[in-house]
Amino acid sequence: MSSVASGWGAYLKGLLASFGLQLPKAISGPFNPSQGTYIDLLPVLVLVLVTALLLMDSKQVLRLNSLLVVLKFSALAVFILVGLFHLNPDNWANFAPFGFGQIYGGKTGIMAGGSLMFFGFLGFESISMTVDEIKEPQKNVPRGIVLALIIVASLYAVVSLVLTGVVHYTKLNVDDAVAYALRYIGVSWAANYVSVVAIMTLITVCISMAYALSRMVYSLARDGFLPQTFQKVSKTHKVPHYATLLTGILSAISSGIFSLANMASLVNISTLAYLVLLAIALIILRKDKGLPQKDEFKVPFVPVLPILSIIVCLSFMSQYSWQTWSAFGIAVLIGSAIYAFYGYKHSKY
């Protein structure tokens, strides 16, 4: 959620810059005194707004969220249609300039890039965090995740092709790449439209993630892994307000002091780690419980598919720097300490 908020801030700063407006340097970047930046204020403000909205009435906010998704698709359509008329096939002359890369420990190539681009596939698991509010979750949750993955992967492929066809990849090391590409080819109206839509719709991503994370904290508290305070719900809107406040405050602090690249790397490696554990759990579950019931989702090709997933995830994890591994280790230690000193004693399982 923090990293998405940082991306939102980047698009807003890009839009403001196109009109000649800039924030003071001290409040326009992550904490780095040597560069004169101390806090990235915009992501903090948007997360405060998102948290406040969810505390008031999460169901109404989620309805607004669904409407804004339509705007998001319209911005992608504008970019694709405009970009098709400005493609330069020479930009695709060397489709893999750094090759495949190394299976383990690489810094360049497809593997290293894939380990970072994995960030674009985060969030789908949040659907499973709302099972208490979904009809027939055994059927609809897996179907929703698979369908969303198919749609989004297809869009990613098309947008990436157009993006690299319009602007050479060496010039795309920016946080607002789509809007930058449109400005690069001189289509300012489309760039501004994409920026405005991104500013509006990235808020919806923050809302979805904040909603899912607060429900995860609520579920952990309900099961005894976190203090019972976090399972309390407000009397008026039936919102887990303490859980929502916790996720909002921690995310706002992170978005204000850490860079987008660092947050993305930490989120990626953490997600890859739990996907490894998920694949292992699936193998064990299939062995102990047998095949799913008739109306339940059945993962195909077990154990081949989970084993392949483990290998791929570990390969991606090996691409990260020791700094990312250190941050991941600290996060694991904090989580383990919470479980050891509280969750183990109070768990209902």
Report residues per predicted region:
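Loop-to-transmembrane helix boundary motifs in multi-pass membrane proteins
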Residues: 39-44, 135-156, 188-191, 218-256, ...
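C-terminal membrane-solvent junction of multi-pass transporters and transport-like membrane proteins
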Residues: 35-39, 229-241, 275-325, 345-349
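Hydrophobic alpha-helical segments of multi-pass membrane transport proteins
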Residues: 14, 75-79, 216-217, 267-295, ...
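Helix-loop-helix junctions that connect adjacent transmembrane segments
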Residues: 20-41, 67-196, 324-327
